[in-house]
Design a protein with these regions (language model features):
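Bacterial N-terminal signal peptides that target proteins for export
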Residues: 2-12
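Post-signal peptide N-terminal segment of mature Sec-exported envelope proteins
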Residues: 33-61
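Extended, hydrophilic extramembrane loops/domains of integral membrane proteins
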Residues: 73-106
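Activation corresponds to long, low-complexity, non-globular regions
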Residues: 128-375, 389-518
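Short beta-strand-plus-loop segments that form exposed binding edges in beta-rich domains
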Residues: 381-389
Length: 518
């Protein structure tokens, strides 16, 4: 086992060294932009050449290109480069789309052998565009598409999509409860999807799942996505955290949240929150409504800063499968979720599940089902990393049976105020991506099978995004710390505890004040 761990670390180190080496010392930022392989940009003055990063590690630089009629191949004229960027054949080129890791547009002078110049695959922003988060670039708003009810765009979003999908190799399906949905009688639901971050977002699918609510109850999803009828929701009788009573934050699904500061010496340090519920028997579940703090976003941004000019090239190695994608999320994995244990009367505690929903924006509400015997008051213990979670709602659900939901595809889509049938078709089919840029707004409408007040609604989104490198981060490039973050996240969390602790008080405010709007 030790050999496997050492080998994995060496592979990451090699990939990282190549990434940093490819950036070189004389870096010149020319705003490279990523594109979905299925949707290459049209040639023109703004895109005079196209870099085609292949999954094999090779590269094509094309000065003209097109998709084949059946959209299965990318064809054009240009030059091929080996894995070490040695120049190969010139002339006509043709590659299968499924062999492409990334597409990139910028300028041809960026292509050089390893060790002499940049071969970035990230958009880098300076000046006015990044001024929205100039106060603290590590506090910039970001983390996937955000969703709002109409007229509520200035408040907190009701959902955020695929927060952990920071690359195409990490594309994932995300389902979030619209738990705070308005209980009206309308049979139509409109959601506003925004790209409010300095990101390129690629959305493959959007749809709703509608489940009939039991009389006077709710429908809750467990971490595996199974739906359960919640016949009754019982608030806790007591809530104790290290700072004292936390009952007011836990009893209702509202704006009140319980949160602590991160540990100043080790960001992985755990804390305990204790709950007490009346005795219960039968099938029950702990209901957890929570979202992450800005800590996880800060660590992601800091890792990108450490990678610096090599961030894009390292990302390409992830896309090609040379590095386990999970290693890019190493510090987040160490921070972990909210581990829950339960005990009845004088019985010992037993684990009942883990809540672990990525993202600091909207969070989610889930249930952790377990069986209770009624032997005495029900005690629940939550273990979580200090400063990593905001607890907004805690309850005990009396569960009924499993519930089936009906999938609802969009019936109309508008982009930036204009009808967009192409996006509608993509969201419904899920066979291609709709690419959004900062400031883009989509209004997505769904027809409901009954009055909204009688339905539990869940939003499914599928896709990925690429964060844009901030020009201010390039001065923090540190290959040693980048390697540490990717190969020894425990030690990285100890070293980053001090820097985060110093900036923690203002990060949340900077995050929410830097939403990007056109």
């Amino acid at each position: 086992m030790r050999r496997k761990v050492d080998l994995a670390r060496r592979l990451v180190a090699v990939a990282l060294c190549l990434a940093i080496a490819s950036a070189g010392c004389g870096h010149s930022v020319l705003n490279p932009v990523l594109h979905d392989p299925d949707e290459p940009p049209s040639p023109g003055k703004r895109s005079p050449m196209l870099k085609v990063h292949l999954k094999s590690g090779e590269l094509l630089v094309l000065d003209s290109w097109r998709l084949s009629d059946d959209r299965s191949r990318l064809e054009g004229t240009g030059t091929s480069f080996s894995v070490r960027r040695e120049e190969g054949a010139r002339g006509r080129q043709s590659v299968p789309i499924d062999a492409v890791a990334l597409l990139e547009t910028d300028s041809p002078e960026q292509v050089r052998p390893f060790g002499t110049s940049a071969l970035a695959v990230m958009t880098t922003v300076f000046g006015a565009l990044s001024a929205v988060c100039a106060a603290d670039p590590k506090g910039c708003f970001g983390s996937c598409p955000t969703f709002y009810f109409p007229g509520e765009d200035e408040g907190r979003p009701v959902a955020e999509g695929f927060s952990a999908s920071i690359a195409r190799a990490l594309e994932a399906r995300d389902v979030d409860a619209l738990f705070a949905g308005r209980p009206d009688g309308e049979r139509r639901l409109v959601l506003t999807m925004r790209n409010e971050a300095l990101e390129t977002q690629a959305v493959r699918r959007l749809r709703l799942w509608a489940a009939p609510r039991p009389p006077g109850g709710r429908v809750l999803a467990d971490p595996a996505g199974r739906l359960h009828a919640a016949l009754e929701l019982v608030p806790p009788a007591g809530c104790r955290a290290p700072e004292g009573d936390c009952l007011s934050a836990a009893r209702a699904f509202d704006e009140k949240e319980r949160v602590s500061g991160a540990d100043a010496s080790d960001l992985a340090t755990r804390e305990t929150v204790e709950l007490v519920f009346p005795a219960a028997s039968g099938r029950v579940g702990l209901v957890v409504g929570a979202r992450q703090t800005i800590l996880s976003t800060f660590l992601f941004y800091q890792t990108m800063a450490f990678l610096g000019r090599g961030a894009g090239t390292f990302l390409a190695t992830v896309e090609r499968g040379e590095v386990d994608p999970a290693r890019a999320m190493g510090m987040a994995r160490v921070l972990g979720g909210i581990d829950a244990e339960a005990a009845e009367g004088d019985q010992p505690f037993r684990p009942i599940g883990t809540f672990d929903e990525a993202g600091p924006i909207a969070g989610d509400v889930q249930v952790l089902p377990f069986d209770a015997s009624g032997a005495g008051a029900l005690r629940v213990r939550l273990r979580l990393a200090k400063g990593h979670w905001r607890l907004g709602y805690l309850a005990l659900a009396r569960l009924g049976g499993r519930v089936d939901a009906r999938a609802l595809s969009p019936v109309s889509v508008e982009k930036n105020g204009r009808r967009d049938d192409e996006a509608l078709s993509a969201f419904r089919a899920g066979d291609r991506h709709v690419v959004t840029l900062p400031g883009d707004v989509h209004r997505v409408a769904f027809a409901l099978p009954g009055p909204a007040r009688d339905l539990e609604l869940f939003l499914e989104s599928e896709g990925y995004y690429y964060e844009w490198m901030r020009g201010e981060w390039l001065s923090e490039e540190d290959p040693g710390m980048a390697l540490l973050a990717l190969t020894d996240p425990h030690e990285a969390l100890r070293r980053l505890a001090g820097p985060f602790h110093e900036r923690e008080p203002g990060l949340e405010r900077a995050f929410w004040s830097s939403r990007f709007r056109k």
